[in-house]
A protein has these predicted regions:
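Eukaryotic tandem repeat interaction scaffolds
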Residues: 122-239, 243
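Residue-level detector of the short coil/turn that links helix A to helix B
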Residues: 19, 59, 79, 99, ...
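Amphipathic alpha-helical segments of tetratricopeptide repeats
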Residues: 29-40, 70-80, 109-119, 148-159, ...
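C-terminal non-catalytic interaction modules
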Residues: 225, 229-232, 236-294
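Conserved alpha-helical positions within TPR/SEL1-like repeat arrays
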Residues: 6-17, 42-57, 68, 82-97, ...
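Flexible inter-repeat linkers and adjacent short helices
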Residues: 1-28, 32-40, 268, 276-294
Length: 294
């Protein structure tokens, strides 16, 4: 029963990555009772964390926040610093999205406390997420410290993808602070590493970031080209959430109104199919703006 529930959990994680939320939820629901019966707190915490992510994508942030809190309690009780840091990061994201900046910063401060007391390289992914979040919250100095730290600490490691992710967040810092050339340098290097490593999801994520910098620098044609390339990769790998995201980006920057509308309508149908309510509402606003001709 123990190995069966671990397999169901893994199946759920893969299905969630593919944007097949109903099937993922079913797999997690199958895994949960045997995990509870066997007292496997690590598995239960992971399941709660994954279910919370699905709830958020469906637009139910309250339920997502509650599940992340429950997962956090379990991670703390079993002394899992990586799980706890991930939970705090996720909670910070939800609080930030709902406009509660102070509470979000409190959650991110908890991640900083974990990092201060544990220099494990396994915490670098959480530090990268933290750096991005602090940048978005306007905490540039704190963000720079974590971006540089994760960049330096991952430099000598075996994990080329992790180092590329750290480079991407450093690129984001330079983009936010107005140094587009340095930003592009880090993003381009990160992309080539991810291309060589054959990680389509990471490749798409960094392509989106690179597109953002090009867009902000007024290089619209190049940004469109990046988004289109990333869309092809997403479609080839059935990354449905990313397909929707890229269609929405293309709908935001395409030069003529008809193309914008086409991209946005396609993005809407992808998000509707996925049940991603929050993104659907945001794209509907973009459609409204495009219709009004702004």
């Amino acid at each position: 029963a123990e190995s069966a529930c671990r397999i169901d959990r893994l199946r759920g994680e893969v299905l969630a990555l593919l944007g097949r939320f109903d099937e993922a939820e079913e797999a997690f629901s199958q895994a949960k009772p045997p995990a509870e019966a066997a007292g496997l707190d690590d598995v239960i915490a992971d399941i709660l964390s994954n279910l919370a992510d699905i709830s958020l994508k469906r637009g139910d942030s309250d339920s997502s926040l509650n599940m992340h809190r429950k997962a956090l309690e379990l991670f703390i009780s079993i002394g899992d610093a990586i799980g706890a840091a991930r939970s705090y990061n996720n909670m910070g994201y939800i609080l930030r999205r709902s406009g509660d900046k102070n509470k979000a910063l409190e959650a991110y401060s908890e991640v900083e406390n974990i990092l201060a007391g544990d220099d494990s390289l396994d915490l670098i992914p959480a530090q990268i997420v933290l750096a991005r979040a602090l940048l978005d919250l306007g905490e540039s100095d704190r963000a720079r410290d974590h971006a540089l730290s994760s960049y330096e600490r991952s430099e000598s490691g075996e994990d080329a993808i992790l180092h590329a992710r750290a480079r991407a967040v450093l690129g984001r810092y330079y983009a936010k602070t107005g140094d587009a050339d340095l930003a592009l340098h880090h993003y381009t290097d990160a992309l080539s590493t991810m291309g060589e490593a054959g990680d389509p999801l990471a490749l798409v994520e960094v392509s989106i970031l690179l597109g953002e910098v090009l867009q902000d620098s007024g290089r619209i044609e190049e940004a469109l080209e990046r988004y289109r390339e990333a869309l092809v990769i997403s479609e080839a790998n059935d990354l449905r959430m990313q397909i929707g995201e890229l269609l929405a980006r293309l709908g935001g920057v395409a030069p003529d109104r008809q193309r914008r509308m086409e991209y946005l309508q396609r993005a809407l149908s992808v998000f509707r199919e996925l049940g991603a309510q929050t993104r659907m509402r945001e794209v509907q606003m973009m459609v409204h703006t495009a219709v009004m001709g702004r």
